[in-house]
């Protein structure tokens, strides 16, 4: 059986890079438009895949492995920027996870923790990326402040306080209603929002509280040609 070649992708020298310091705690978010040359080939690769699987973690949808050529493009383009913005050098990154991702979980099927902004890890030396391979009509990503604690990020020193505050809300019957958060609520304030745009990359610390902008009326299509397709990447210390 013939093996399809991996998509050819590389950093776009004309990419537009912006670094924002969001919220009162001024956590960095990097937004890169027109990130890669060959992004269309990535979308075609995802559409051709038959291996999207139900996610076993808290991602609300389906995932499939991104190609090795994508990882190589990240390796070739981002280390210098990451060190300048986040103070993290390549030797601190022990593993990288890159996955095609599709939001497919309907609001009524969400676990309560999927209805609120989340952190990906408690290590500020770990980073997350979302690379949109869809348009703005499918929703971007927002960053949030937890009102009771004032936290906009949750590191190891804040974890117990944050989880304790959420537990207190649950005991008091203040659970979020079924559905995705997409703006201000009694518990959380939106402090920054980025639209999806084809070939836009967002890069931020795993500790930052964030959530996808999944609006009412969203079509939870499982076809990557039609759904909210992205590549989600984690740069991890272990």
Region roles according to the model:
Residues 1-238:
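Fe(II)/2-oxoglutarate oxygenase catalytic core
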């Amino acid at each position: 059986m013939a093996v399809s070649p991996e998509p050819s992708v590389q950093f776009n020298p004309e990419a537009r890079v912006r670094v924002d310091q969001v919220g009162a705690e001024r956590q960095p978010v990097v937004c890169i438009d027109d990130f890669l040359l060959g992004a269309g080939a990535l979308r075609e690769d995802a559409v051709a895949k038959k291996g999207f699987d139900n996610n076993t973690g808290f991602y609300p949808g389906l995932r499939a492995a991104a190609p090795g050529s994508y990882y190589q493009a990240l390796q070739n383009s981002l280390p210098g920027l990451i060190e300048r913005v986040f103070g993290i050098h390549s030797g601190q990154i022990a593993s990288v996870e890159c996955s095609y991702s599709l939001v497919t979980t309907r609001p009524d099927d969400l676990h309560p923790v999927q209805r609120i902004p989340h952190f990906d890890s408690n290590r500020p030396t770990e980073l997350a990326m979302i690379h949109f391979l869809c348009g703005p009509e499918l929703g971007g990503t927002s960053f949030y402040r937890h009102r009771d604690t004032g936290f906009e990020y949750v590191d190891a020193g804040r974890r117990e306080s944050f989880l304790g505050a959420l537990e207190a809300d649950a005991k008091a019957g203040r659970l979020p209603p079924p559905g995705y958060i997409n703006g201000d609520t009694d518990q959380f304030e939106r402090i920054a929002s980025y639209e999806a745009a084809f070939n836009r990359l967002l890069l931020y610390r795993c500790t930052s509280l964030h959530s996808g902008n999944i609006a009412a009326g969203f079509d939870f299509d499982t076809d990557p040609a039609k759904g909210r397709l992205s590549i989600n990447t984690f740069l991890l210390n272990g």
